[in-house]
Amino acid sequence: MAHELTIEVANHPISMEIEGDAFLHPVREAYHPFSSDRDPEFRLSVYPDHNLMVQDESSVGLTFSNGEVKIVDDYLRGSLDLRNNTGEIRINPVWFIASLAIFVRNMFTLILILKDQGLVLHAVAVLRDDEVYVFLGPSGSGKTTVAQLSPECIVLSDDIVFVKPFGRSSYAVFPTPCWGDMQRGDRENRGYPLKMMFKLARDSEVYLRPYGLAEGISEVFTIPHIPLDTLSLKDVLKRYRRLLAMVPCYEMHFARDGRFWQAIDRERMSLALKEG
């Protein structure tokens, strides 16, 4: 017997029709904050398959052909048809929830990038006073440290951050399910305005250095983790250019304490005075 569950991320509801009873409760528990009663845009059929085991490591990853995306990992094999908004995934129960998370994360990434003109950033998103501050950098740059040094703030994610245009002159950051990253605090399943962005630089001093547009693009630009034949490099650059033209971006030198928030608050006040 199949059971249907609809979840919504970044304003996109999808239904998951899960075959059998064994994994219905853990899936509902994992995605409960993102449950939705809206009509789904995508329909995904999910089948446990005890015999599934990907032996050929060269087949692992994402491929795109004729409007269909195939996603293969150690314990899953799935596809998305972007022409009729349907998908199918088979998962070995030995790694069910984690494998489903891999597929769903990639699915929403594709939707955000291909349908919303959005971007997916390797960053930590911190919600403070109903506005989001995004801190970027490679592994080891201090993203998790920033989250730990912000105990009174809500951490939307410290790994994958969904950003998309909101109106004509602003951007919104959306919460995502817990896909193996650190999250903290209660938040609503909606977009929050993106206030500032920071590229992290560990230092004994604490200060902000504003980026110009060209330098900012070169510092924060990353190629999205999707098949490149679905999106041109020119289009990706255009999206970063638009984002950084609207959202202030800085190199943030910080020590292992919370003083960087004082520097951010001073910069906020300075920007408010200029705008006023």
Regions found by a protein language model. Give the residues of each.
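A noncatalytic interaction/capping subdomain that flanks phosphate/NTP-handling catalytic cores
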Residues: M1-P138, L149-L156, V161-G276
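Conserved glycine(s) of the Walker
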Residues: S141-K143
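Hydrophobic positions on the alpha1 helix immediately C-terminal to the Walker A/P-loop
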Residues: V146
